[in-house]
A protein has these predicted regions:
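Accessory terminal regions of nucleic-acid processing enzymes
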Residues: 1-315
């Protein structure tokens, strides 16, 4: 790969905190899907919040640790299967044509203008990888890497724990690259550089980001302008949801009355189940009755959240 035309910033010996600070300065491959709305883990709002330092660093989860630890295994497994050779780069790559972006790639191919992305995932995700040309969830990331590196193709190897090993090839498509990089540049110039947030969407990850950024409420009032139509729509939708929830409960109860003690029922092409499930819970009242001298309060975990409500004043 012709990486000599690009700027390299070595990541050898770099701490995780240093690496996180560096990746926040530009758009990376893992940000691409969120920017264009193809990720369930990120949105334009959350990427903006991350790049502008409003969100804390993500906790290093067990899944993330496994992904790093098994990256070398996935690469070796891919080489065994394909007969191709790869090597580490250990650097952030920057292309002067795209100053708003960087690439931190897993492996470079030896003797080929290409790269390799290594992934590990749960067996629950196996259906996403069977019988597909290229997994959608990793498509934007690999297009981003081809844009920054100038590679002609990008390979993807996915280890699904206990279920299979999948390999894919994505050929360079300049039109796709141009479209993605235009979207990334527009995102960077429109939102990150002027520190202007994108309009929040309705996803859970955006809701979590807002709750994190504005975790501590202040006892003050602000005047909202131009939101009256939206709030009126909100009130209508809440009423509609209440009516729909009521009808859903009514249908459920009618069917339960039909099934009685039976746990299974069929009707046309519908299969219905109403199964008995057990749930264990801790009885604080019984515990203190049996062990009155033990104080459990030091072990209670207090969580805080802000509750959103809209009250429509009657005129």
């Amino acid at each position: 790969m012709k990486t000599m035309k690009m700027k390299h910033v070595s990541t050898i010996g770099m701490s995780r905190d240093e690496w996180l600070r560096l990746r926040r300065q530009t758009v990376g491959g893992s940000d691409a899907a969120g920017i264009i709305g193809l990720s369930k883990w990120a949105t334009p709002y959350t990427v903006w919040a991350d790049k502008t330092g409003r969100l804390p660093d993500k906790e290093d989860t067990e899944a993330m640790r496994l992904g790093r630890d098994l990256e070398d295994y996935v690469a070796r497994r891919w080489m065994e299967e394909t007969g191709k050779k790869v090597r580490r780069l250990n650097a952030m790559l920057y292309n002067p044509a795209y100053p708003f972006s960087h690439a931190d790639i897993d492996r470079m191919l030896i003797g080929e203008e290409a790269g390799l992305e290594c992934k590990t995932t749960s067996t629950l995700d196996v259906k996403q990888f069977k019988g597909v040309v290229f997994p959608e969830k990793y498509y934007a990331q690999c297009v981003h890497y081809m844009a920054v590196t100038g590679a002609e193709r990008w390979y993807l190897a996915v280890l699904v724990f206990g279920s299979g090993f999948f390999t894919y090839t994505l050929e360079r498509d300049q039109a796709e690259i141009d479209a993605l990089m235009a979207a990334e540049e527009d995102f960077w110039r429109t939102y990150v550089m002027p520190d202007t947030p994108p309009v929040p969407d309705g996803s859970d990850v955006t809701a979590d980001a807002l709750q994190t950024i504005y975790a501590d409420g202040q006892d003050r009032q602000v005047e909202l302008f131009g939101r009256a139509p939206m709030l009126e729509e909100y009130a209508r939708l809440k009423d509609q949801r209440k009516a729909l929830d009521g009808r859903l409960s009514e249908i459920e109860n009618i069917i339960k009355g039909d099934m009685q003690e039976a746990e299974h029922a069929v009707c046309g092409n519908c299969a219905i189940t109403w199964k008995t499930q057990e749930r264990s819970s801790f009885s604080q009242t019984d515990f203190y009755r049996d062990y009155p001298g033990i104080d459990l309060s030091p072990y209670y975990k207090t969580t805080r959240s802000r509750v959103f409500r809209v009250n429509t004043a009657k005129m």
